[in-house]
Swiss-Prot record:
Record's keyword annotation contains Nucleotide-binding: no
Domain of life the protein comes from: Archaea
Protein name from the UniProt record: Arginine biosynthesis bifunctional protein ArgJ
GO biological process: L-arginine biosynthetic process; ornithine biosynthetic process
Active site: 171 (nucleophile)
Cited function: Catalyzes two activities which are involved in the cyclic version of arginine biosynthesis: the synthesis of N-acetylglutamate from glutamate and acetyl-CoA as the acetyl donor, and of ornithine by transacetylation between N(2)-acetylornithine and glutamate.
Lineage of origin: Archaea, Methanobacteriati, Methanobacteriota, Archaeoglobi, Archaeoglobales
One Gene Ontology term, aspect cellular component: cytoplasm
Compartments where found: Cytoplasm
Catalytic reaction list: N(2)-acetyl-L-ornithine + L-glutamate = N-acetyl-L-glutamate + L-ornithine; L-glutamate + acetyl-CoA = N-acetyl-L-glutamate + CoA + H(+)
Residues flagged as site, Cleavage: 170-171
Pathway per the UniProt entry: Amino-acid biosynthesis; L-arginine biosynthesis; L-ornithine and N-acetyl-L-glutamate from L-glutamate and N(2)-acetyl-L-ornithine (cyclic): step 1/1; Amino-acid biosynthesis; L-arginine biosynthesis; N(2)-acetyl-L-ornithine from L-glutamate: step 1/4
Length: 379
């Protein structure tokens, strides 16, 4: 199921080298959540302004240039992107959502965007190929486009994101479309909760982008129960978050940190995020080194209420190796190493003896290729 399987969604895109441009025609209700970085890209500011009344008729996206830290010129360029799309789509400028991703601090090549936008518009359609072209247009260092859907709730989403990913949200753009009928206020409430339970639990490298944008758009053609929709939206976002971790720049392994028995959920999530964000843990995962001391240390500095009564295990989804039992090391490092070498996905499970709090985070290993990719990013 592609985004073009949602009735009323037409899209297209073009990719030339590092630069891409995507366009969507869609009329409906819209909600968005955006970066928590204090340095906010121009398209984030403009997009927030434009979707404030909850109505959308189009989306325009460019990749290769973030249009961030570009001052007043950046704001003018973001608004011009909306104006270009509006003129093509035959709608008001304020009905266009805009997003950008790429290198920070460089001016947009507006001449290229002006030239390519009519070409993209002329190819708008609802085919699988249209959806694929839009997906390719929005990626940067991604190895693949992230996609997920729910037939049950009539949701389809497409996203990009591979590096500069850390709570809150991750460098990510995500565009989710649904034919389920909800107003913008309902969409926002469900979007905010779903993003918090998924994207805000994801960390690749500890950096938070200036451009994070997640948009949820409803064409309002079908009735879906709200509880069902929100549960399915979480599932769609969880799938995309896992794909982002799998595609973390240079990543070879994805892992989840699951915590229970914490004093409360807040503490559990603090611990999970600290472990998932730890560079020492990430490099240990890459090296298949069951150095559980790094995990314990991260739990200890997380800010949560922690003591030595921790039970720690590693699992590949089939087999589980316990390394610590209620504070007592078990000497199972070699068994854990063998499990890590075979696994593509791991679960690090920490059980505390503080209460009933539960939490989780998603991460990936940190490899030599991550350094190489990011050392050469702007060259």
């Amino acid at each position: 199921m592609e985004i073009t399987d949602i009735g009323g969604v037409l899209c297209n895109g073009i990719k030339e080298g590092k630069y891409g441009l995507g366009l969507v025609r869609v009329r409906g209700s819209i909600a968005g959540v955006f970066t928590q970085n204090k340095i906010r890209a121009a398209p984030v500011i403009v997009c927030e302004e434009n979707i404030r009344d909850g109505v959308v008729e189009g989306v325009i996206v460019n990749s290769g240039n973030a249009n961030a830290y570009t001052g007043e010129q950046g704001m003018r360029d973001a608004r011009e992107m909306c104006r270009i799309a509006a003129n093509l789509l035959g709608c008001e400028e304020r009905r266009v959502a805009v997003a950008s991703t790429g290198v920070i601090g460089r001016k947009l090549d507006m001449e290229w965007i002006r030239k390519k936008a009519p070409e993209v518009y002329s190819g708008l359609g609802n085919s699988v190929e249209n959806a694929e072209r839009f997906g390719r247009a929005i990626v940067t260092t991604d190895r693949f486009v992230k996609k997920a859907y729910s037939e049950k709730a009539r949701i389809a989403a497409v996203a990009k994101g591979a590096g500069m990913i850390a709570p809150n949200m991750a460098t990510m753009l995500c565009f989710a479309f649904t034919s389920a009928k909800f107003d913008s206020g309902e969409l926002y409430d469900m979007l905010r909760r779903a993003a918090d339970k998924t994207f805000n639990r994801l960390t690749v490298d500890g950096d938070t982008s200036t451009n994070d944008t997640v948009l949820l758009i409803s064409t309002g053609k079908e009735r879906v129960e709200r509880d069902v929709f929100e549960e399915e939206l979480c599932s769609v976002f969880y799938s995309i978050a896992k794909q982002m971790a799998r595609d973390g720049e240079g990543a070879t392994k994805v892992f989840e940190v699951r915590v229970d028995g914490a004093r409360n959920d807040e503490d559990a999530n603090l611990i999970a995020r600290a472990v998932a964000s730890s560079l020492l843990v990430k490099t240990a995962i890459f090296g298949c080194d069951p150095n559980w001391g790094r995990i314990i240390a991260a739990a200890g500095y997380s800010g949560a209420d922690v003591d030595e009564r921790i039970t720690l295990s590693l699992s590949d989804g089939r087999d589980e190796v316990f390394l610590i039992d209620s504070g007592r090391p078990l000497g199972n490092e070699e068994r854990a190493r063998v499990l890590m070498e075979k696994a593509e996905e791991l679960v690090i499970r920490l059980r505390l003896e503080k209460g009933n709090g539960k939490g989780f985070a998603i991460g990936c290993d940190l490899t030599y290729d991550y350094v190489k990719l990011n050392a050469e990013y702007t060259t």
